[in-house]
Regions:
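Amphipathic alpha-helical assembly/interaction segments
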Residues: 1-136
Length: 136
């Protein structure tokens, strides 16, 4: 196994133990629950987009964790961050359109913030790994 792969797997734990993945999983579940309350005419539009963006955050963290090399892992984490920004935008739209109430919005917003913080920390950790040596 190349040095960068050994470093990647010895420093970063299995994805299920990562706080970023755990928060993202909770966020995905809450996004799916919130989307159920959207109007029928939004179920194949904004509600579906919220579900897919929510799922994408944790799925990309998990998939990136199984990849070889920090550079590839970072790419998946960047995609997870982009999906998180999509979730943030959709929940703001949903609040403004009165599809979700203030309590649901507050809960989802808090989850996106916490997920973002832990995801950013994981990205910094992975960036430190790749800075120490070439990636595969």
């Amino acid at each position: 196994m190349p040095l960068s792969c050994r470093a990647h797997h010895s420093v970063v734990a299995h994805y299920k133990t990562l706080k970023a993945w755990q928060h993202a999983q909770r966020l995905a579940i809450e996004c799916s629950r919130a989307a159920r309350g959207f109007p029928d005419y939004e179920q194949n539009a904004l509600a579906d987009q919220l579900r897919r963006a929510g799922y994408s955050v944790s799925l990309n963290i998990a998939e990136g964790n199984t990849r070889r090399g920090a550079r590839e892992y970072r790419r998946y984490l960047d995609t997870a961050r982009a999906s998180l920004a999509e979730v943030e935008t959709i929940i703001e739209m949903a609040r403004d359109l009165d599809y979700i109430g203030p309590a649901d919005f507050g809960r989802l917003e808090a989850l996106t913030v916490e997920t973002g913080k832990t995801l950013w920390g994981l990205l910094r950790k992975i960036a430190g790994i790749s800075a120490r040596g070439p990636t595969s």
